[in-house]
Amino acid sequence: YMGLSIGIVGVRYNRSTNHTETTLDESLDLKELSYQEELTTTGGGVDIKVGILGRVTDRLRMGVSYHSPKWLQLDDTYYTRMTTTFRTPDSQGNFSYTGESPDGIFAYRVNTPWNVLASAAYVAGKNGLVSVDYGITDYRRMKLGGDNAIPDSYDFAYENGVIDQRFTRSQSVRVGTEWRSGNWYFRGGWGWWQDPYAGTDARHGSGY
């Protein structure tokens, strides 16, 4: 068996940050300072997934799949606002003053890492099965890029260099089994994931 899918990815992210400081000393004329930051990220992209599954014998099945990076085109829209409040008004009776930045717009591209997965399963008739999955993801393939429609846009060379230095190829192994005894079913699993940062591993134990 062989399968192919093309995915369409939509992105919308909103972040609102509010920071307020109030003076407790009433002898100070400045009463309160408030800072607000708004960020909206929108965009989309595509990805491709392809896989092959074969039955080696009546009991043994093997497969392999490839998940391409997500190729994303994103746009950030942001602005900031600051408000100061005083205890005594000015000559026009105003206690507060507010200043806003102009709206900022920044377009860029993001590529996520690809992933390859190989799997095998042994089916012991109606009694149970054992499955093994091996995956590999190269986090060094994450990339940032400027907007192709804008000449001389920022190329993210520094950021991509940091990704190459701090990330590495990550592997994972998962083993699962299920067995039947009468009306009872017993399940267990074990997994090992290599951290995308070099030098540390994360292990998840077994269960039933």
Per-region residue spans from a language model:
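Outer-membrane beta-barrel porins/channels
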Residues: 1-208
